[in-house]
Amino acid sequence: MPLREFKIVVLGSGGVGKSALTVQFVQGIFVEKYDPTIEDSYRKQVEVDSNQCMLEILDTAGTEQFTAMRDLYMKNGQGFVLVYSIISNSTFNELPDLREQILRVKDCEDVPMVLVGNKCDLHDQRVISTEQGEELARKFGDCYFLEASAKNKVNVEQIFYNLIRQINRKNPVGPPSKAKSKCALL
């Protein structure tokens, strides 16, 4: 089976760890220094459910920046990672509007999405409970939810692998259909 390409967009407020999660997944390293992203694109080939996949991951600026570019990201993306920080209420509270914007741009209710509560290694600074994340995921229509830590490599691969599975379920790839004959007997 040929290599299938996936366009994944990572969205959320500035400082939630979008770049850290993406770089941890793609390169296997944790970026300690915070350097605000304008836009970075990464490619990684992975195997999911015995299928070779080429991921193009767009790591975006925080939601408070470059809003004009966001509609374009959303239009082209096949799946979305919505990230908040478990140590910040405001990053969590922005996600319902972000999800609504994705649904509006895609003009679809069934968009592959993963909700991620990042920085779960900072449990002593936690202000958003796991239950709050689970409840938001339910409100999003049983969106896949998990907590992650880019620093400690917790659930990082699962974010992207689950998203690939969702995209595959929505757009399955089967064997090419044979062209039907357009011949008619009279």
Swiss-Prot record:
Q: What is the effect of changing G12V?
A: Exhibits severely reduced chemotaxis towards cAMP and enhanced accumulation of cGMP
List the SMART domains.
Answer: RAB, RAN, RAS, RHO
| Naturally occurring in which organism (per UniProt) | Dictyostelium discoideum (Social amoeba)
Q: Which residues carry this modification: Cysteine methyl ester?
A: C183
Phenotypic consequence of G12T: Enhanced phagocytosis
The protein depicted here goes by the name Ras-related protein rapA
Any one GO biological process = actomyosin structure organization
Record function comment: G protein of the Ras family that positively regulates phagocytosis and negatively regulates macropinocytosis. May be involved in the activation of guanylyl cyclase during the response to hyperosmotic conditions. Overexpressing cells generate alterations in cell shape and contractile responses. Involved in chemotaxis via regulation of the balance of Ras and Rap signaling at the leading edge of chemotaxing cells.
Enumerate the residues binding GTP: 12-19, 59-63, 118-121
Tell me what topology the record assigns in the membrane: Lipid-anchor
Q: What class of enzyme is it?
A: hydrolase
User: What keywords are assigned to this protein?
Assistant: Cell membrane, GTP-binding, Hydrolase, Lipoprotein, Membrane, Methylation, Nucleotide-binding, Prenylation
One Pfam family matching this protein: Ras
Q: What is its main location?
A: membrane
EC numbers:
3.6.5.2
The protein's matches in Gene3D superfamilies, at most eight in alphabetical order, are given as:
P-loop containing nucleotide triphosphate hydrolases
Query: Propeptide positions in this record?
Result: 184-186
Q: Which GO terms describe its cellular component?
A: cell cortex; cell pole; cytosol; extracellular matrix; leading edge membrane; lipid droplet; pathogen-containing vacuole; phagocytic vesicle
Q: What reaction(s) does this enzyme catalyze?
A: GTP + H2O = GDP + phosphate + H(+)
| Highest taxon in the source lineage | Eukaryota
Recorded hits in InterPro entries, A to Z, give: P-loop_NTPase, Rap1, Small_GTP-bd, Small_GTPase, Small_GTPase_Ras-type
> Isomerase: is it a keyword of this entry?
no
Its quaternary organisation is: Interacts with ralGDS (only when rapA is in its GTP-bound state). Interacts with the Rap guanine nucleotide exchange factor glfB.
